[in-house]
Regions:
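Sensory/regulatory domains in signal-transduction proteins
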Residues: 1-83
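PAS-family sensory modules
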Residues: 26-32, 58-153
Length: 153
C-alpha cells in the first residue's frame, strides 16, 4: 500500500476480518472517550519475527493516533510463504492478526507458527501457496477482549 493511496481513508477499509475490525472499533470508541489502549502484537516479515507494542490514544481535533514501537526483533532464514512476491492460489490461509500464528486446524482451534504450518499443512507440496488472510485466534481474542474490558473501568 502506498501512503498517498491510504491517507484520509477509513481504517476500516483495510481490516477485512469482522472480529478484528470489531475489536479495533471498540478500542477506538473507548479512546475517543478519553482512554488509551496499549497491547503487544506480532508483525513478522519473511526474514524476521517482530514483537511490537501498539498504543492507541486520542489525538487533536477528534483524531485517534496509533503508535508502535519494536520490543523485539529476531532474524531468521527467509520464509517464502510470507513474501508478497510469491504467486498465490485463490485459497485462503488464516493468520492471527495479533500473534501471527497460522490456523492449522480448520476450526479445531489449533494455531501454530508459520514454519510448523508449512510442514503440517504440507504447503510446499501445493502448486501455489494460498493467500494469507487475517483473523484472530481464541487466545488473542480473549486477551484483546480483556484489554477492551479494562478500558471500560
Amino acid at each position: 500500500l502506498l501512503q498517498a493511496s491510504i491517507i484520509g481513508k477509513p481504517l476500516w477499509n483495510y481490516i477485512s476480518d469482522e472480529t478484528t475490525r470489531s475489536l479495533y472499533q471498540q478500542m477506538v470508541a473507548r479512546v475517543r472517550e478519553g482512554r488509551s489502549a496499549q497491547f503487544s502484537l506480532r508483525c513478522d516479515g519473511p526474514d524476521c519475527r517482530r514483537l511490537l507494542e501498539m498504543t492507541i490514544r486520542a489525538g487533536a481535533n477528534g483524531t485517534v493516533e496509533f503508535a508502535t514501537r519494536t520490543l523485539r526483533l529476531d532474524h531468521r532464514a527467509p520464509v517464502a510463504m510470507l513474501s508478497r512476491q510469491v504467486p498465490r492460489s485463490t485459497d485462503l490461509l488464516r493468520v492471527c492478526a495479533w500473534c501471527n500464528r497460522v490456523d492449522a486446524g480448520s476450526g479445531t482451534g489449533q494455531w501454530v507458527e508459520v514454519e510448523d504450518a508449512i510442514e503440517s499443512l504440507r504447503l510446499f507440496e501445493l502448486p501455489l501457496p494460498p493467500q494469507l488472510t487475517h483473523g484472530i485466534c481464541e487466545t488473542c481474542f480473549a486477551a484483546m477482549s480483556k484489554t477492551i474490558q479494562n478500558l471500560n473501568t
